[in-house]
Amino acid sequence: MFVIDTLLFTIDFTRFPGNSTEVKLEPGLHVIYGESGVGKSSLVQHLSGTHGNYPGNFDLEIEKCPHMIQIVLQNPDSQIVSDTLDGELAFSLECNQTDSAAIQSTFLALKEELPFSINGSRHPVTLSGGEKEILNIITAFSTAPELIIMDDCLSFLNRRMKSFILEKIQQKLRANNQIVLWLTSDIDDLQYGASCWELSLSSLSQFTPGEKPIFPCRKLMEGSLNLEIDSMSFDYKDERKLFKQMNCTVNNSRSLGIVGANGSGKTTLASLILGINHPDSGAIQLKLKGDNAPTMAYLDQFPERLIGEDTLENLLQKFLSIGKLQVHLHKKCITVMERNQIKWDLIRNKSSYDIPWSMLRIALIVILTHCEFDLLILDEPTFGLGWTQKVNLLQYLQRYLKQKHIIVISHDVEFVQNICNVVLSLDDDSITTSDLIQIERKDT
């Protein structure tokens, strides 16, 4: 088969006559930045031939496109097909090869590429969000496709791990003469591109670097969130010990940040705070205003897990029925969503699985902040959000913190530094800012 080593297409924004752009991409890493909701995933679907007949804000005419295409999806769970890590690594190889010796050799090489130790019989669902993203990247490149399209699929990774994975990607595309098109909501990712573009609702244009904006700063008043961890140990069965005799004390926090490398135990610590999991030994206790049992709500890094296939409308009605949401705040909650470009009437009766991830995440944050909980725990709240959307979320949560308390679990150190007054670091990837109280974990 004749190899096409160029991706050439014209994008035409139909509601803006004359606003079209021709894009020519040759082997290398190319980055398109865009805020959530501008059409990044729609562009992926157009390029891969999976776009439906529903209207969008642009049309695409593809003039040249490689034959062998691999897509890496935004939600890492959507790409995992096997019930073991070994099976996941071998799946693509077995679909594309018949030589068992070659499959075994490549499989072992892929296993070596994982930057974390694994038990091959472990279920992929037990990996952290970032570890799943790494797994999907490795399997996507395993069959040496000519074009790899990455749909905001590195947003769970901290800076150090993201740089490490991108260097591995650069090595592969140089060796195999591949085109990698990476669509991202993180403006910092533009630094990695051989060509850099910005997608908006009205245009796709080459990105012009400028001075990076900064988050608006607001000093938080002292809070009453206290966390005591005393000689706590915990591990998942047959896996490495995440916490070994860990000790930590947090006093009078208004907003507590939990940061750390991918797989360091951030989400697991949240499950221990919530009582979903329990320490193997030692103790962990959270108090608020002297209350040993504050009411808490947790928004998972995979937000659809909060309601499953149910709808946001039903969730609101449940909160109303149990008294967690007051009737007079119901309308205000919907108004706040509308201000954040969330069209309530369009999503209210949709299954959570049919709502774009970032939209679902923001909608759930708005709902939970209008309910009567003493403490919110937000796991990766900025995932998939562009710079302006992060600023809007920051300012919204800063207003919420005048009365309430939150715990923010995130790899997004810059966001954590600006929304939290105390930060617990689960590894040595330290935060350096004079305005924060930083607490390092202490394990024996």
Cite the ranges covered by each PLM segment.
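Conserved H-loop
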Residues: 177-185, 404-410
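Conserved beta-strand-loop-alpha-helix hinge in the C-terminal portion
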Residues: 191, 198-222, 428-444
